[in-house]
Each structure stands twice: as structure tokens, then as C-alpha cells.
């Protein structure tokens, strides 16, 4: 039985390696400077599109921590003149799904849709509303700020969050990587619609974006899709950077008292 299991695992690994070996990735750049990666695959009638931006929380201006996270969050809550409820329903009606996330370095949006032309075209139109024409409605901004602030307050009572924030601060000091990605209560309260619009304009440009297209479309169709995405994004040729990380000299043990019954231990050291 054990030998048969090993044989099955070996065959599976060989199959996977062979699949990766045959994977053909086409690359090009759009006229606006977006980098595109495309994998054609007709096994399933599915199309996946992922658009990445150099718009992570490390780009938050001092005094406006939480701006990157809030901007990304609001882009999907009303766009192209369509409110958040109708937008979600229209994606759902055609069996499409939109998602995304933001981290220290980057923000991204992803779309999964059926590849048949009617569903695909409708899904891409809605997707482009989100990344091309976010509305940033002021009442929704205020509502979501309150929700995020409530989550921050709750998280600051949890030992895991307290430990993670202290650990990152010990590693990165005053570098943007040492800050809370969600921001803090004081800075979030001050953010407004103009801040979000300006951050979107500065950091969601086609010049610093990358587009990944995988699935049941031809190369010509993928090029048309990538161009239509790239053309509608803010234009510009500004290349944003993140300050180099300076190694901290802190060595030792930091203990934080907490009434929780469990202990959280985080350890780290300089590495590549």
C-alpha cells in the first residue's frame, strides 16, 4: 500500500512538472506602459483577469496612514455611477466574481467570469468601472471609516495584533513597513473624499500597473482586453519608490503584558 502511494505521488508530481514545463506565458506592454502576462487555456470556459498596482500601504503619506487601504476598499463600493448594491448584483447576475486586496507594497483587483462573449464583455465592463471610475461617495466613505475604526479598536485588544504591530515596529522602526496597514484612528478620522481621489490618481496609473490574463481567450482577444483596461486608467510616467529599509540595531526580548490565557511569541532576524 505504501509503495503504491509513493508511486501515485511520483506520477502526480511528474504530471505537474510536465504541465508547468508546457506552460507558455506571453508578455507584452500596452501603449500606456502596463506590463501584461497572458496564458491561453481552453480547458474550461473561464477567464481570470488580475490587475496589480504599486499602491500598497507603504505609499501612505505621513499623517494619512490608512489611505491606501481605504481607497482600495471604496473602489468596489460604487463605480461608474452604479451604487454598491447594484454593482454587486450585476456581477452576481452574470456569474462573475470580483475580489482584491492591498498589502504593504501593492494593491490588486481580480475578476473571474465565464468566457462566452456576452458574459465576458458585461463582466469586463463592470470590472473596468471599478478600476477606471470609482465614485468614492462621501456617505459610504464615512460609513466605512467608522467600520474600519471599530475593527481597529477591537483588534488592539487582541494579543496577536498587539504582538504583530510591536514586532513590525521593532524590525522596521519609522519605515512605512513598520506601520499598521489599516492606519490608525486619528489619521483615518481625517481622511476625506479628496484624499481618496488624489491617491487613486497618483497610484492607480497604467504606467505602474501589471495585468495578468489567464483562460479561455485567444491572444488577440487578450491584447484587446489589456488595452481596454490600460487606456481607462490614470495616465502618467511617474515611477514611485519605497525608501530603503535600514537594519535596526534592536537585539533582545520585548515582553508585553496582556490578560489573555495564551502567549504569542514572535521571533525574527535580518535575512535576504
Language-model regions: role of each:
Residues 6-18:
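Bacterial N-terminal signal peptides
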Residues 20-46:
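N- or domain-start disorder-to-order transition segments that initiate the globular core
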Residues 22-27, 169-209, 241-246:
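Histidine-acidic residue clusters that define the catalytic metal-binding segment
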Residues 37-39, 44-70, 84-131, 149, ...:
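M16 family metallopeptidases and their MPP-like homologs
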Residues 84, 88-89, 134-153, 218, ...:
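Acidic/histidine-enriched alpha-helical segments
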Residues 127-136, 230-237:
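A common structural junction motif
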Residues 147-165, 249-262:
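Short acidic/His-enriched helical or mixed secondary-structure segments at domain edges of catalytic enzymes
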Residues 177-181, 186, 208-272:
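An aromatic/glycine/proline-enriched structural segment found at the starts
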Amino acid at each position: 500500500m505504501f509503495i503504491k502511494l509513493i508511486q501515485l505521488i511520483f506520477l502526480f508530481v511528474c504530471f505537474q512538472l510536465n504541465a508547468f514545463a508546457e506552460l507558455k506565458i506571453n508578455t507584452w506592454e500596452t501603449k500606456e506602459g502596463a506590463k501584461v502576462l497572458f496564458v491561453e487555456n481552453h480547458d474550461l470556459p473561464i477567464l481570470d483577469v488580475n490587475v496589480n498596482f504599486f499602491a500598497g500601504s507603504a505609499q501612505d503619506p505621513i499623517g494619512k496612514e490608512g489611505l491606501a487601504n481605504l481607497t482600495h476598499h471604496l473602489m468596489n463600493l460604487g463605480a461608474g455611477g452604479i451604487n454598491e448594491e447594484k454593482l454587486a448584483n450585476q456581477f452576481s447576475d452574470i456569474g462573475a466574481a470580483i475580489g482584491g486586496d492591498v498589502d504593504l507594497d501593492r494593491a490588486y483587483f481580480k475578476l473571474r467570469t465565464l468566457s462566452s462573449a456576452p458574459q465576458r464583455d458585461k463582466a469586463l465592463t463592470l470590472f473596468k468601472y471599478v478600476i477606471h471610475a470609482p465614485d468614492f461617495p462621501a456617505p459610504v466613505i464615512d460609513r466605512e471609516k467608522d467600520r474600519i475604526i471599530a475593527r481597529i479598536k477591537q483588534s488592539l485588544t487582541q494579543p496577536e495584533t498587539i504582538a504583530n504591530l510591536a514586532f513590525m515596529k521593532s524590525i522596521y522602526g519609522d519605515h512605512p513597513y513598520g506601520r499598521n496597514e489599516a492606519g490608525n484612528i486619528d489619521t483615518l478620522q481625517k481622511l476625506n473624499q479628496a484624499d481618496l481621489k488624489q491617491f487613486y490618481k497618483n497610484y492607480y496609473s497604467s504606467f505602474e500597473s501589471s495585468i495578468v490574463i489567464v483562460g479561455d481567450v485567444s491572444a488577440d482577444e487578450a491584447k484587446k482586453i489589456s488595452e481596454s483596461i490600460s487606456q481607462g486608467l490614470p495616465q502618467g510616467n511617474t515611477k514611485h519608490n519605497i525608501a530603503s529599509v535600514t537594519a535596526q540595531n534592536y537585539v533582545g526580548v520585548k515582553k508585553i503584558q496582556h490578560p489573555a490565557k495564551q502567549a504569542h511569541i514572535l521571533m525574527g532576524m535580518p535575512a535576504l
